[in-house]
């Protein structure tokens, strides 16, 4: 689950991190009032959406008067902001953050933390190249990114934070400031089940103070049951409606931009299915894992969710029967097709537990389903059917 910038900053502030202060505004009038309370002559209007690249997309603007703050806010609210991290539809702007102006600054730094699955540890990343996409830095100048892995038994140690501070070129009182900041960031990361934390830029102001100008936090959704205060921060308007509906039925669904819907059991098989669709010239419209213990009701709902996507021109159902029986899947497919007005070709590949029985049930159903033998055959048939 992603947090908005203002939510991420407030969380970091509660752990002692210095942040760029600001107020939320849901209208132009509220933005004008917030501008009056800003301690600086210039304010920054920031569209609050779950996506990076807002500045280049026109979602971050400087304003010098309350009238300008009102105008910019009215122009942003109610629109969809399209950035390099969103799809073509963009993300809805429902409110803005009216923040104090932190510039000019001495330098912009980057500080981030992730769960490194290879080392199974929290890993911090820091760079002197703040204010730009870290992906670009990693690609063009990877030597400018410093990494430090944290031993979960002892946590972040002061010497590790000091080492990062030295590499970032900090000096004097800035060293102790950074150690406190990084220690607080680590504490926030662990205590709130964060899986991604980014402070970009982390600015060194002209007075030498270090401050978090922006903040991005992603929470492990599997941990929300024990984080009620964090869960209450969820903004469903920023999430795909089909993904939200899928979550209600314990379905792992991720919307993509293709035209071939996929229903698969098992994350690995789902990834392989999308890969082979791409290999044969198609474009998957989604990732959907119905799970190893899929029930008939869940399969029916999965089919409905796939077909709710207007861009879907065909569906590939790829099931390997292990825990889940292929005959049950077949019955669920029939029930779903009868319940939903299916106007697109459907290719079905069943293997494993009761696969022959499942195939027989589908064949005797009288429905216009395309049977496939093997993964390659299934991919070729759905791509051909969509192109026909």
Swiss-Prot record:
Keyword Metal-binding annotated: yes
Residues annotated to bind ATP: 46, 53-55, 100, 103, 108
Keyword Ligase included in the entry's annotation: yes
Gene Ontology MF term list: ATP binding; magnesium ion binding; succinate-CoA ligase (ADP-forming) activity; succinate-CoA ligase (GDP-forming) activity
Cofactor section: Mg(2+)
GO cellular component annotations of the record: cytosol; succinate-CoA ligase complex
PROSITE patterns per UniProt: ATP_GRASP, SUCCINYL_COA_LIG_3
Cited function: Succinyl-CoA synthetase functions in the citric acid cycle (TCA), coupling the hydrolysis of succinyl-CoA to the synthesis of either ATP or GTP and thus represents the only step of substrate-level phosphorylation in the TCA. The beta subunit provides nucleotide specificity of the enzyme and binds the substrate succinate, while the binding sites for coenzyme A and phosphate are found in the alpha subunit.
Name listed for the protein in its UniProt record: Succinate--CoA ligase [ADP-forming] subunit beta
Species of the source: Psychrobacter arcticus (strain DSM 17307 / VKM B-2377 / 273-4)
